[in-house]
Design a protein with these regions (language model features):
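Active-site-adjacent alpha-helix immediately C-terminal to a catalytic or transition-state-stabilizing loop
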Residues: 134-182
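Active-site-proximal alpha-helix that buttresses catalytic centers in soluble enzyme cores
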Residues: 2-80
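Short, well-ordered beta-to-alpha junction loops that form the rim of enzyme active sites
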Residues: 57-61, 83, 153-157
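Phosphate-handling substructures
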Residues: 26-31, 72-132
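Generic structural signal for well-ordered alpha-helical scaffold segments
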Residues: 41-48, 130, 134-142
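Short aromatic-enriched loop/helix-cap "lid" or pocket-rim segments at secondary-structure transitions
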Residues: 15-20, 90-94, 165
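Residues at the C-termini of beta-strands that transition into short coil/loop
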Residues: 8, 82-84, 177-180
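Short, active-site-adjacent cap segments at secondary-structure transitions
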Residues: 13, 63-64, 86-88, 158-160
C-alpha cells in the first residue's frame, strides 16, 4: 500500500487571460496569482516530510507552477502526467469565456457528473476523469518499491473523481492510500 498525496494547484490568475481575450483551452496557460504562489509554498511545506519518492503533475501552467514549489521542498524532479489534466468542460474546445464554462459545470452537476442515458454532452463525464486519473496513480503506486509515498499535483475535478470529495481548496492536500483508488 502506498500513500498518495493529492494536491490541488494554487489559485490561478484567469483575469490575466481574460484581459488578453484568449478563448478556450488557452485559459490553461494562466499562471498562479500571488495568493496561489503562497498556497503552493504552504503545500510544499506540508509535504516536506511525507517521504515522497515521486512527484507527478498535470501539464497545465497552474499545476506545474504549484509542483515547482513543492519540488523545492521535497527535492524531487517533476514527472508530467498528461492524464492528470483538468476535466474537459467542452471536448470541442470551443468555449470562449468563464460564463460558458460555468454553464457547462452547472449542467455537469445537474446530471450528477455523468451523461444522461442515451444522451451525449460536450463535457467529460466524471467516470472518464476517474478512469484516466486512477490509472496514472495506480501505475505510479505500482512502481514504488521499498516504501515511500507519491505526490500528485492536479485539479479539483481529478481529486473529486478519485476521492468523492466535491470541494477542495486551492493548495489543499488530501491523502489517500493506493488501495482506496477506484
Amino acid at each position: 500500500m502506498t500513500a498518495i498525496y493529492l494536491v490541488r494547484h494554487g489559485e490561478a490568475d484567469y483575469e490575466l487571460i481574460g484581459k488578453r481575450r484568449w478563448p478556450g483551452k488557452l485559459a490553461d496557460l494562466a499562471p498562479l496569482t500571488a495568493r496561489g504562489v503562497e498556497q503552493a509554498a504552504v503545500a510544499g511545506e506540508e509535504l516536506a516530510d511525507v517521504g515522497a519518492v515521486k512527484l507527478l503533475s498535470s501539464p497545465f501552467t497552474r499545476t506545474m507552477q504549484t509542483a515547482g514549489a513543492v519540488s523545492c521542498r521535497v527535492n524531487l524532479a517533476i514527472e508530467v502526467e498528461l492524464d492528470l489534466h483538468e476535466w474537459l468542460p467542452d471536448d470541442t474546445f470551443r468555449w470562449h469565456n468563464l460564463t460558458e464554462v460555468r454553464a457547462l459545470v452547472a449542467d455537469f452537476d445537474s446530471c450528477g457528473g455523468e451523461w444522461p442515458a442515451g444522451e451525449r454532452r460536450v463535457w467529460e463525464p466524471l467516470s472518464s476523469v476517474r478512469r484516466r486519473s486512477a490509472a496514472v496513480l495506480r501505475r505510479a503506486a505500482a512502481s514504488v518499491t521499498g516504501g515511500g509515498s507519491i505526490i500528485a499535483v492536479c485539479h479539483e475535478m481529478v481529486i473529486r473523481s478519485v476521492t468523492g470529495e466535491v470541494k477542495t481548496r486551492h493548495g489543499e492536500v488530501r491523502r489517500i492510500e493506493s488501495s482506496q483508488l477506484p
